[in-house]
Amino acid sequence: MEYKIGTDARCAVIGYGSWATAIVGLLAANRRRVGWYVRNPEVLESLCSDGRNPRYLNDLEFDRNSIAPSSDLDAVVRDADIVILATPSAYLKDFLAPLTVPLRDKFVVSAIKGIVPGDYQTVVEYIHDHYGLSYRQIGLVTGPSHAEEVSRGKLSYLTVVCADPENARRIGERFAGENICFSYSADLYGVEYAAILKNIYALSVGIAVGLGYGDNFLAVLIANAAGEMTRFLEESYPDERNTQVSAYLGDLLVTCYSVYSRNRRLGLLIGHGCTVKSALNEMTMVAEGYFAADCIRHINARHKIEMPIAEMVYNVLYQGASARKCMKELTSKLI
């Protein structure tokens, strides 16, 4: 199905976490009323009464005329032309469960950097298979863009990924802002998997820091992670792509180094000696790399690509292996 986004297309956002909130902020700043599915009663009440999300980015105040928060998923989706998914991947099915309105006449944009657990599918694959959308009706908004900086107007670079360049440009127009720069790509597979893999690699960096490894080693670890990511993409889905640009390498770097990185934080706790269970309990937000490590290992069983860093993270998270021992063994496999 050929789908063309119109100039007056209306947007709706599914989710109420930090990235969803930052996205709504960008859309609302363009003087377009944004539909917003918020299933948490406390958050919904606060958004309706004072224009703030009390749980995430609560210093961001919305003009209440620019947002239309609702707990009625069908109504939010029905009134939109572009539906933007911004939930943790582990909760996507739960968020969409109440939906009875068909998505087949919508354009769906995933802002999720994770795999749907249990289904072992990327969000793009899941929406295609379960909701009957053509891949030409599905896009991505991604890049090295922590919500905390985007919401505060820090210069950020986003990549819109879409099969149709005109649709990509239309999506970009809705996110446009003084401090937002855009690039465009048609590599749905590569960009989405890069955004998933970088979370696993950020976990490995956090573990290394927690164990006491220094900057010299981190540089080697991240360089090898970049190579491992490229190898996975080239061997699992060969295509002409430059993995040195921001949607691939840039997103990897910011997730590995940033103080805002949830995945680095989870790894840091484990490296400091926390059990995986206690580290997860201490996290206040979802670290996508935890779910991705298991999913990527399952997916890679088909491809049999050499991925020593991802394998190390999986062993620590799911096999109860010693982080110190696994990291030591990994050091001999890096170049």
Stretches found by the model and what they are:
Residues M1-L60, S66-S71:
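NAD(P)+-binding Rossmann beta1-loop-alpha1 motif at the extreme N-terminus of oxidoreductases
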Residues D63, P69, L73-R78, I82-G153, ...:
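Rossmann-like NAD(P)(H) cofactor-binding subdomain of soluble oxidoreductases
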Residues V205-V209, E234-I335:
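NAD(P)-dependent Rossmann-like dehydrogenase/reductase catalytic/cofactor-binding core
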Residues L155-L158, Y189-E234, V245-R265:
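Active-site-proximal catalytic alpha-helix in oxidoreductases
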Residues I115-D215:
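Rossmann-fold dinucleotide-binding core
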